[in-house]
Curated annotation (Swiss-Prot):
Protein name, per record: 3-dehydroquinate synthase
GO molecular function: 3-dehydroquinate synthase activity; metal ion binding; nucleotide binding
Originating organism: Listeria innocua serovar 6a (strain ATCC BAA-680 / CLIP 11262)
Main location: cytoplasm
Taxonomic superkingdom: Bacteria
Cofactor binding mode and count: Binds 1 divalent metal cation per subunit. Can use either Co(2+) or Zn(2+).
Residues annotated to bind Zn(2+): 184, 247, 264
Residues that, per the record, bind NAD(+): 106-110, 130-131, 142, 151, 169-172
Compartmental location: Cytoplasm
Length: 365
């Protein structure tokens, strides 16, 4: 089975990925889990309804397994749900020898990792992602919940024991969710690998390709790209910030939509278009943006804004971005495909780029 090793400064761990990963690692994994006093599974309503039986079959021989089913979507990454999970764990009697399994998409991975990092000052956890989007979030140890004023503002760096990535779960993903996750695959290509971007554009030309073409080699490459960056900079003091390409504007948009109007990948797609546009202005990026957006549209992405989003709201939200320091907004831009840089953007440039994107897309004024 394909295995990728993540070598972070704090921990080295494997990522198992294929269509039957859960079955393939069952014997080895359950032996490891049997060493813990209690297995606590954190999932959401959607995943529990569709896939709980699959995980139950793997965990069947373990004596003590408890589930917590969180609400779907970004609602799960709130103080209220975080506190409720903690209460459940305390009432259940989980001790420091317990282990947590985050079974779901990126939201559950973020929440589960943050719970594991903070319960009794830290217990081990495993990532069992069920979405395309989670190929990015499940690897690298960023765990967090949201604050009403910003996405992922309360968090930590906390690595899992392993990532078990069973791609059979993709079959039940709605097209919109597939698209959202695919956006992070595009991001990895833009910041690191022109050949990967070309392969993505050549292989995936219409929405049904998400289900009929093999995503696994592209996911593996994306995970390898991220693992290499995390090995250099686990806690985002330097190059790891490159993984935030498209996220400064994208997170600002998500916050404006109360973390529900747009899926993460949808907001990041807008953010990448915004960052590419600014890259053309600042660095003269030689990139056929029109061809790129046409390709996105063929895949079903909306590349124009069809709602009114005041610039003042976006700017305020960008100021709350974690990369903002001394009130200076940091953007991840591209000198070329595969050559990201950190750029301190002045308000005037942020506004001019905003006007340019809106003029090329929808009218937001």
């Amino acid at each position: 089975m394909p295995e990728i090793t993540v070598r972070a400064k704090s921990k080295t761990y494997p990522v198992y990925i294929n269509e039957f990963a859960l079955t393939d690692v069952k014997e080895q994994w359950t032996k490891s889990l049997a060493k813990y006093s209690h297995v606590f599974v954190l999932t959401d309503e959607h995943v529990a309804n569709l896939h709980k039986a699959k995980l139950d079959a793997v965990l069947a021989d373990l004596p003590v397994v408890t589930y917590y089913v969180a609400p779907n979507g970004e609602e799960a990454k709130t103080f209220r749900v975080y506190e409720d999970v903690m209460t459940k764990m305390i009432e259940t009697g989980l001790d420091r020898k317990a282990v947590l399994i985050a079974f779901g998409g990126g939201v559950i991975g973020d929440l589960g990792g943050f719970v594991a990092a903070t319960y009794m000052r830290g217990i081990p956890f495993y990532q069992v992602p069920t979405t395309v989007l989670a190929h990015d979030s499940a690897v690298g140890g960023k765990v967090a919940i949201n604050h009403p004023l910003g996405k992922n503002m309360i968090g930590n760096f906390y690595q899992p024991e392993a990532v078990i990535y069973d791609t059979q779960f993709f079959a039940t993903l709605p097209e919109r969710e597939m698209r959202s996750g695919f956006a992070e695959m595009i991001k990895h290509a833009l910041i690191s690998d022109h050949a990967l971007l070309t392969a993505l554009m050549d292989t995936f030309t219409e929405p049904k390709d998400f289900y009929t073409k093999d995503l696994t080699p592209f996911l593996q490459r994306g995970i390898e790209i991220k693992a290499n960056i995390v090995a250099q900079d686990e806690t985002e003091q330097g190059v790891r910030a490159y993984l935030n390409f498209g996220h400064t504007f994208g997170h600002a948009l998500e916050a404006y939509g109360n973390f529900g109007k747009w899926l993460h990948g949808e907001a990041i797609t807008y953010g990448m278009i915004y960052a590419l546009t600014m890259s053309e202005t600042v660095y003269g990026l030689d990139f056929d943006l029109a061809k790129f957006t046409t390709w996105l549209e063929r895949l079903g992405y909306n590349t124009t804004f069809d709602v009114t989003v005041p610039f003042s709201n976006i700017l305020d939200n960008m100021r709350h971005d974690k990369k903002t320091t001394f009130n200076e907004i940091s953007m991840v831009l591209l000198e070329d495909i595969g050559k990201p840089v950190i750029f301190k953007a002045e308000d005037e440039l942020i506004f001019d780029t905003y006007k340019s994107v809106m003029r090329n897309g929808g009218d937001l004024f």
